[in-house]
Amino acid sequence: MAKPIVAIVGRPNVGKSTLFNKLAGKRISIVQDTPGVTRDRIYAEAEWLNYKFTMIDTGGIEPKSEDIIVSQMRRQAQIAIEMANVIIFLVDGKEGLAPADKEVAQMLRKSKKPVVLVVNKIDKLKDENNAYEFYNLGIGDPVTISSSQALGLGDMLDRVVEYFKDDESAGEDDERINIAFIGKPNVGKSSLINKLLGEERLIVSDIPGTTRDSIDSYVDTDFGEFTLIDTAGLRRKSKVKEEIERYSVIRTYASIERADVCILMIDATEGISEQDQKIIGYAHDINKAILVIVNKWDLVEKDDKTMDKFKKELKVNLSFMPYAKYLFISAKTGQRVVKVLQTAKECYDNYNKRVKTGVLNDVISQAIMMKEPPIVGTKRLKIYYVTQIGTKPPTFIFFVNDPACIHFSYQRYLENQLRENFDFQGTGIKSEFRERKEK
């Protein structure tokens, strides 16, 4: 089940990125600088009043003419409208109501999506009167903030999460397995999906996806019901290349959010890129099941060692997710295509796997006997018992004498024991250590 998406929308220079970065610095946990982290921080995980959601900074493009302002603003707003559950409509309280604000407001009213109107740059109490003219937008009561001074952000977020409570669909689980096909343009995502649809011959329907330029295809098989999310699109180059790349990334991230399993497709003739590492790293960071597919394998000159060598190089570049499954195919010739959905289903089953508490503790007891916990300072870690508290991904809590005694190497050892005994290939696992006083 995907978390709600909150998009910050508005014309250029109203302070969208400043607001996003302020929230990121205050409330959003950004993982350390690894290939799994997007440095531009277009997307970030957020939590307020125990509601978890994903925040998007739609950014603002500096235009060269008034016409470009309007067209780029419209594109930005439309993308955000399509993917968001709640929209923060940001306006500039110092500059006042602008014609472009009215055009954005008109789009938002037509969307019938929940909108929180936020008047930014209200740095002083006396400036609050500047907000009154924005009632003319017909979007509702404005919230006044100063993103630069972090004033009013709590009131704004209170309004945002109120809409989550009204969203009954947020609590519904879809029985279908959502699979996002991600990767660079022309790597063969659409070709593979078309091949899968042609071979399965059980397509329910093709419907426009929730993110622009993506298509959701429904496929039923003997072993599962799947939604295939094609993130292909925007393949042609443009004069505004940076803008298009930015929106392409936003759409891909939205598809990852919706997915249970993320399939990273790599061109066998090109190998893996930094862009590939970043995009699949995001899926890893938010704990999705992962399958890496090397496409166009028919174009590679090979011997009996080529595949192992290629996979070894991939594992070095994707060392932050050693659990990933790999598959070498040719969407063009159909080589191993029949294994794609089967392997994705295996990843999903492991992603959704539960282990009985008794069996779990037997394995951990054996692991402790084979390798005793290290002494940290003057204290040795004692593990009393372990239990699984969740799936997607499998999440375990270890009750111990002192969580400070757990060394990362021993935590990795315990997780590896879980992997070896319960086959968690294709999914990350999470472990947490909590103190329990010895009786």
UniProtKB/Swiss-Prot annotation:
Residues 353-437 form the KH-like domain. GO terms for biological process: ribosome biogenesis; tRNA methylation; tRNA wobble uridine modification. CDD domains: EngA1, EngA2. Residues 4-168, 177-352 form the EngA-type G domain. Keywords: GTP-binding, Nucleotide-binding, Repeat, Ribosome biogenesis. The keyword Nucleotide-binding applies. GTP 2 binds at residues 183-190, 230-234, 295-298. It comes from the Bacteria. One of its GO terms (cellular component) is cytoplasm. GTP 1 binds at residues 10-17, 57-61, 120-123. GO terms for molecular function: ATP hydrolysis activity; GTP binding. Belongs to the TRAFAC class TrmE-Era-EngA-EngB-Septin-like GTPase superfamily. EngA (Der) GTPase family. NCBIfam families: GTPase_EngA (TIGR03594), small_GTP (TIGR00231). Associates with the 50S ribosomal subunit. GTPase that plays an essential role in the late steps of ribosome biogenesis. This is GTPase Der. It comes from Clostridium botulinum (strain Hall / ATCC 3502 / NCTC 13319 / Type A). The lineage of its organism: Bacteria, Bacillati, Bacillota, Clostridia, Eubacteriales.
